[in-house]
Structure formats: structure tokens, C-alpha cells
């Protein structure tokens, strides 16, 4: 009896915290489900046919999470242009659109990584809050894993941004290979411009600039053929014209 009494208040504290923050708890559960489905798609332990269904479930769960988060950020829905403009500034709206773009498309492993990693990062943050409510010294091994995940957050966000960027040519390739729709590259381009302009997550914009600097450094070397240099410079100029203006 003496061993079990301390666990009661700890567990009650965690449950009370989750009940007090019901919307955050609902998003936490949907993110954990997204991570679960994404993992079973990336690692098809139950077979390739089941993996495709887990791909769709992961995107649907992410759409639910994004919708809940958007409601949390903008609780008072209005059918107006001003509300839509405000919604398009939110990262949750971006990934609601992202989920809808890919949910009925041919399964692409690259497209599931942003969903998986964002869900993992946000779920880890809330899990730490639940553990804190349970007790400052509860489950030290899990806390250690969560701390390591947080320590690598910047690298993970850069990897997500890299996926977001290279999915643009991937959607074009899918179109010409017969695995994508005609509208998908255009809608995804709109998503990418929203990510480029994101106020809360500048990693997509930063990575674009870093890639441009790296390419320019390589093509300016004397060993680079002239036609390759011209092609790259024209491509950089074209992409720069497509980039939205960021205030």
C-alpha cells in the first residue's frame, strides 16, 4: 500500500490536466494516431496493401488535427474574405490544405514525412506537459527521449522544409508519370507559397535561400560548364520571380 499511494495523486494530476485542456488533448491523441499510421506506412509491417490505407489514415488524422488547431487559433468562424485571409496565414491551415492535396493521391513516402515529423514534435511537447502534471520526476526514460527530440527540433524542421520544397518537382513528375492529377502541381505551388510566407515557421524560406547560395557557389566555379551555369541562373531567376513578397 505504501508503494501505490504516491502514484494516485500523480495519475490524477495528469488526468485533471488533460480534462482541463480537452482540445489540446484531442489534438495530442490525433497526432499520436498520425504518428502511428505514418510509421506503419513507412515501415509496411502489415503488407503493402495495408500500408496504402495507413497513408490515407495518417493524412486524414492530420487534417483533423489541423482543423482543430485552426479552430483553436481562430475560434469565431466568419464567411468573409478577411477571415479567409487571416486563416491562410496560419500554419494549421497550410497543413489542412496539404492533407487534402495528398489524401487521395498516389502514396508518396516523401509527402508523409512532414506530417509524421510535425505530429511527432507537437505530440512530444504536449507529452512533456502531461508528464510535468503527473510529477517532475515521473518516467525519466521517456523524458530523456523527449529531450533529445527537442534538442534536434531545428534539424527536423529543416528536413521538413526540404521535403516541402522537393515535393514541388515531385508533383510535376507524378503528373507526367500518370500518378497525379492536373491540378495537383498548381494547388501544391499555392501551398508552397504559403509556407514560404509563414510567420511562425521561416525554415522553408531560409532553406530556399541556402539552396540558392549553394547552387550559385557551385556554378561560379571555373570547372562548371557555361551552359549549366546559364541554365541554373535562369532557373534561379525564374524561381525567384515565383516567390511571394514577404513583408
UniProtKB/Swiss-Prot annotation:
Subcellular location: Endoplasmic reticulum membrane; Melanosome; Nucleus envelope
Transmembrane regions listed in the UniProt entry: 32-52, 101-121, 156-176
Tissues in which the protein is found: Prostate cancer and several cancer cell lines (at protein level). Widely expressed. Expressed at higher levels in endocrine-resistant breast cancer cells as compared to endocrine-sensitive breast cancer cells. Expressed at higher levels in early recurrence breast cancer tissues as compared to non-recurrent breast tumors.
Membrane topology: Multi-pass membrane protein
GO cellular component assignments: endoplasmic reticulum; endoplasmic reticulum membrane; melanosome; nuclear envelope
Predominant place of localization: endoplasmic reticulum
Gene Ontology biological-process entries: endoplasmic reticulum tubular network organization; innate immune response; membrane organization; positive regulation of IRE1-mediated unfolded protein response; positive regulation of PERK-mediated unfolded protein response; regulation of endoplasmic reticulum tubular network organization; response to endoplasmic reticulum stress
Induction profile: By endoplasmic reticulum (ER) stress.
Keywords: Acetylation, Endoplasmic reticulum, Immunity, Innate immunity, Membrane, Nucleus, Transmembrane, Transmembrane helix
Lineage top rank: taxon: Eukaryota
Segments in the Lumenal topological domain: 2-31, 122-155
Residues on Cytoplasmic side: 53-100, 177-247
Residues carrying N-acetylalanine: 2
Record InterPro entries: PER33/POM33_regulator (IPR051645), TMEM33/Pom33 (IPR005344)
Key word Membrane present: yes
Similarity-based family: Belongs to the PER33/POM33 family.
Quaternary context: Interacts with EIF2AK3. Interacts with ARL6IP1, isoform RTN1-A of RTN1, isoform RTN2-B of RTN2, isoform 3 of RTN3 and isoform 3 of RTN4. Interacts with RNF5. Interacts with RNF26. Interacts with PKD2.
Record's function text: Acts as a regulator of the tubular endoplasmic reticulum (ER) network by modulating intracellular calcium homeostasis. Mechanistically, stimulates PKD2 calcium-dependent activity. Suppresses the RTN3/4-induced formation of the ER tubules. Positively regulates PERK-mediated and IRE1-mediated unfolded protein response signaling. Plays an essential role in VEGF-mediated release of Ca(2+) from ER stores during angiogenesis. Also plays a role in the modulation of innate immune signaling through the cGAS-STING pathway by interacting with RNF26.
Protein name from the UniProt record: Transmembrane protein 33
